[in-house]
Structures are given as structure tokens and as C-alpha cells.
Amino acid sequence: GPNCIGLMNTWHHSVFSQPIPNLNLKGVDLISSSGATAVFILESAVTKGLQFNSVWSVGNAKQIGVEDVLQFMDENFDPEKDSHLKLLYIESIQNPDRLLFHASSLIRKGCKIAAIKAGSSESGSRAASSHTGAIASSDSAVEALFRKAGIVRCFSREELTTVGCVFTLPELKGKNFAIITHAGGPGVMLTDALSKGGLNVPKLEGEIAEELKARLFPGAAVGNPIDILATGTPEHLRLCIDYCEEKLDS
């Protein structure tokens, strides 16, 4: 601190605000420069069912900053007991080398880290400075640092908590994706996003596609994305999921 809400973990609570998330040893660790933003992120996470192992709010970081908490987690990391998932909200990177070293070290130990770096624009830097006394850092420098460390960069609390939820899932095998939707537009956008991420959305055609199409409403598309139409039923959705799981290669 100052300008923080304290910390909480499965052994100790020093937070006097809500919401208080479900604490779980296998949940995520959240480190936030801002106390109010920690609560803001918690509100988003709770609605998604995302659980936390610990929450650290460092405020103005006059004594302990984000880098210090990461160093503590790295140097005391127990792969059997500690969370492998870290979410960060950062306004000031006071020691980029330390952040890089300990984030990279944790990732090599099997952790996954996602972070928001606020105040990377000129106006944002001014706002962050007035909020927590943050030192400005250019957007390109932040991008390079995160890429080198292996940190997934996020730009909103919804993106951060969604990535946190993805981190909790088992690792995916293969690069092929089937998209099932009841509206064409989202399917197109998701196809673009997956393709830009180096993943495949292979075209479905031939006997497999015709067999599936015959079991959906007229007008449904099965080329991948699979569009069951707005009038599609829950049974159609179940059918498509089972079909993709059983008959398509990953």
C-alpha cells in the first residue's frame, strides 16, 4: 500500500470489502496494483465460477510491488501445493528485468500467466501516475516484455478472467477446431480469431457433411462453421457436438 485492499489467501484474510471469492488451493493467484480494480476483477471472475488461491493488492507499491510478489511466488514455488495460474493487473513495472526473470521462471516451472498492463498510452500513463504514482512504460516495450516472458497479454477484466477460466481447463490436443453456432456472424469472427492464432478450422465436406446436414433443419450450414440456425434446437446442438467429437480428427 497505500491505496490497496490488502491480501487474502487460504490461510489469511486481510480484506474488508466484497466480493470475497471462493478460495481454493488450485484456484488462480491475482496480483493487482489497484485495490478497486482487484474488486472489479473479482466481480467478473465470481460470475464465471473462477476460483482463487490468493489475492494480492499492492496499491502504490511503496514497500511491496508486483515484482516482489512474483519473486516470492517463484522462489517459494511448490509444484505440488501452489497454484500454477497467475493473473496480473499492473500499472507500473518498476523493475522490468525482475518481472521478466521471475515470470519466465514460473512459466518454465509449469505456470501460466496473463496480465493487463494499464497506462501504456500517453494519456493512460498520466492517469496511472495520478492514481498510483506509476512510472510510464511504452506499449511496445510492454508488448516485447510480455512476449519474451511468455505472459498472455489482456486488455480488459472480461478478457483477463476469461483467459483465467481457459487456464483451468485441460490442455487441448491437436489444432483442428469445429465451430458450432446458431448465428453466422459469430462463427465468421471466431474463424478469423482462431486462424490468426495459428489454429485450423478445416472445411467439412463429402459424406460426413451430408450425413450431418440431413439431420438438421433445411438451410443449416455444415461446412465449418456449423450453423444450426436461430431455430435450431438443443437436440441439434447436442447432435453436432457428439458428431464432431466422434467423427472428426483433432
Place the predicted regions along the sequence by residue.
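Catalytic-core regions of core metabolic enzymes
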Residues: 1-250
